[in-house]
C-alpha cells in the first residue's frame, strides 16, 4: 500500500498539504497526525483519497512507539512524508515558560527527527520528505529566540539528510516560508498580541506557500524552498550581511506602531 504521512494535519500548512499533495503523488491512503480528532476526521470530506486519522501528541515520546507499531504492522510504502507539526512563542526569553520552551524543542526538532527516522526504512527510491521550516532558520531572531533556533536546526538537518539519502534515491527538502496566515498566531502571542512582538509587515497565504513547496520538492533539486520575492531577497541578504547587524532588524521593526496585517489582537 502506497501512503503519504502528514503531521500537524489538523490545521494551517499541514492541512493544506493534505489538500494539495494528490497533484504530485498518487497514494492509496493519507495518514494524518495531530491532536484534534474532529479536525482530522473532517479531512475525509475535503479530499478524494482515503484518510486515516491518527490522534497523537508528538511532544510525547510514547507517540513514536505508536507510529513504529503501525508501520511495522502494515509495512506501507511511504511515498511522501510531510513533517508540518510545530509551534512557536513570541516574547522575551523570560516571558516564555520553561514548559513552552521544552515543547517547542520537542515538537519542532525531536518529533521531526523521530518521524523522519521511523519512516525512512519504509521508503523506496523516488520517495520524498518535506520538513516544514521557516524564514527564521537563516539567522538568529531575538524575541522568538528558541523558535528561530529550532528552525535553524531543521534547515541544517534537512540539508544534511538530503545528502545522506541521495544514494537511496530519497529526496529531502526544507520549506522556509515567511509569516503565513494560520492558527500559528493563535498560540504564538503571549497575551492579546501585546509584548515585544507586535509588528508584521507581510503575511502569505498557506495555499500559495504549499503550492510553491510541493512544486520545488517534485520539480527541482533544491534542498530548501522559499516562497515570494521579498523572502528570497531577505534570505540572500542574511548570507551577505553580518548577523550582528541582521539581528537588529526584527527588534527595530517591533518599535513601529502595532500592525499585525490582518490579525486581530488574539492572533487570528
Predicted regions mapped to residue ranges:
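Conserved glycine-rich cofactor-binding loop
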Residues: 10-11
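Conserved glycine-rich Rossmann-like NAD(P)H-binding loop of the short-chain dehydrogenase/reductase
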Residues: 22-42
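Conserved NAD(P)H cofactor-binding loop of Rossmann-fold oxidoreductase domains
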Residues: 84-89
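Substrate-binding pocket helix/loop in short-chain dehydrogenase/reductase
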Residues: 92-94, 100-102
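Active-site helix of classical SDR
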Residues: 116, 150
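Residue(s) in the substrate-gating loop at a strand-loop-helix junction
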Residues: 134
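SDR active-site lid
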Residues: 167-229
